[in-house]
Amino acid sequence: MNKLFKILLGLLWAVPLWAQPCSFSISGYITDESTQKPLVNVHIFIEELQIGSFTNELGFYEIHHICSGNYHIRISHIGCETLKVFLPVTETLTFSKVLHHHAELIDEIIIHGEKQNNTTQSSQAIKKEEIVLKGNKNLADLLEEITGVQSIKNGSGISKPVIHGLTGNRIGIINNGIVQSGQQWGNDHAPEIDPFVAHHISLIKGTGALAYSGGSLGGIVLIEPKELDNEPHLHGQTHYITESNGRGHTANLQLEKKSKGFSWRTLGTFKQSGDTHTPDYYLTNTGKKEINGAFQLESHFSEKWKSNLYYSLFTTENGILRGSHIGNSEDLQQAIRAPKPYFTQDDFSYSINAPKQKVSHHLLKWKNKYQFSDKIIGEFIYAGQINNRKEFDVRRSGRSDIPALSLLQTQHTIEGLFTFQLNDRKSIKTGIQNQLIDNSNNPETGILPLIPDYNSIQSGIFGIFQQQKNNWFYEYGTRYDFKHFNVVSISRTNRSIERFNHLFNNFSFSAGIKHFTTEHIKNSLNIGWVSRSPEINELHSNGLHQGISGIEEGNKNLKQEHAFKIIGTTDIKINNHLFIQVAPYIQNINDYIYLQPENEFRNTIRGAFPVFSYQQTNARIIGNDVMIVYEPTENLKLNLRHAYIKGDDTQNKTPLIGIPAQKLFGSISFRLSDKIHWKNSTATLNGQYVFKQNHLLITQDFLPPPPAYFLLGTQLTTQYQLKKSVLKWNLRVENMLNTTYRDYLNRLRYFSDEKGINFIMGVSYDF
């Protein structure tokens, strides 16, 4: 009896000991990222316990009776991408989050996982869910989701972004904090970046991005991977996309985990497609193939010192439309006016033959971040890049497998960046950046190179001051860049070696102001002065540029460009239903460098090609970007975007060539109510009208601009929630009316129509 009493007494004492760890709770607020308003009926769910709660009208939730342990929290809301967070619980916690319910209007900049809302720069971001949905596209095509951005193309698989009428060397592409190197001068040289590596793609349209690079007159594109999570379990994503036009396939796998002492992430991507199809014929030899990969490793040596190692590989092989390479000038002029390209085949093929491109790009980055004190943070970065580009022409005597252009570029970057937090409302960011480039031609081509061998040294220093005072935010910045070219070229006349040295000193300044006029109105103004040195192709190109099917002639006497730009932005939010953003801008560019088509077709042993030469003038570009989002109910959203731009040669009183036409885009989206397992089901109908570029003289190009066109598309998306994973489906139709059209910004519009109807299906699995 005494023994039984002791056992019962022990059990009574044990009950509160067992129950005590399950007395914890989690509570917090869920708000909208762009409006800062509370979100109602957000579901917060603990996967391991299969319990959850919904937010009330204040955006508040509570979950009780939680034991000590590690949990995966799933946060879902209609119209938002489901958020999954790993949360260790050892006590009662306050856990609040923001969701991207109106992602169209988010103007934050995500840099290494940190939101930079305190900036006057005009910016917008593309979120991970959009990148995954359209992962079969390249970077430039993805950026067209942002108002004011279009693409200059060289066929169906090669494109690069045009921001406020500027492209190429005037656009800075920042890949994980490093200026993307390579042969960026060519309009047929698409950025060698796999969009799947990015968690956010941010676009800064102002001139205030002095911390990244000098000479970016058009804007800055930031490609930012996701910060590595503090998650001890293996997680990942797999994506597959197939499309009918070109019979393309895209596959991607991503894995990440926190191991003892470090965290890691790896991913791989494979893409392949064949000849695309217009409504009437195949575009022969327009296939492409990509194999890409990336690896990221991060370790915390102490609370103050964090080290990150990143490597990425991008490889691609792109076919160039066979009908764009013609044998003589008479046939070329006939081909330009022909309704159908020469050499068009009647059958589909995955084969990629000459003319074609093969490119590989390696990026290695080592970053160390050290917090010297609560107010001083330093970053020390080394990066190396290797870019190998080969271009193949249709050559006689079976020599098409020998590249006509073979370039190898190595680049080294060293940076030191410091942030000084003077107080809660003032900060200074400063840094010094050094870059060394070695660019050489492989002699295997047997052809005088388009671009000569050269070395380049560039050093830059910048400083940015930011201050917030009541409802006002101020930003001032300055930058100095020193750039030196050492060029070794071969003369076209007597075949002698010629050496040139070019030295440039560039100064850039910016000032910005932002005013939170009311709770619903925000105004910002950014003014900048930017200098840009001419690049190697503008100075010294001399020969056939295969990707544009033309002969380019550089000008060794080109001077620096000097640009003065003003961009204003007004954001208006009314009753959490109507959102309006207006962003007018004007940019004056002295000594603007442009590629002028000459009234000449030149015969060479490689065929007949039009001639282009680099010239300078004074230019003015004005425009306005407008976006309107109306959400009358939680299930219905209307989106309207309009981009107007006009460019003029103020010196010669003529229009600028290569400026995009006006573009109007609209969409209507309907969201279905969430079911037990089915979430975020949306149907979207969209239309795009591109105006004819009438602001151009008929003598300025080989052909007049193509007529205006309208494209209709649709998109269906949904996801199925499993216990600890998510399965997502999407179906898209592009050019669903199978419209025949040509785009002014496609350099191959001289020879062919654009792609016809395209059915795209994608599936993703998050685990």
Predicted features by range, described:
Residues 182, 197-199, 210-280, 286-293, ...:
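Outer-membrane beta-barrel translocator/receptor signature
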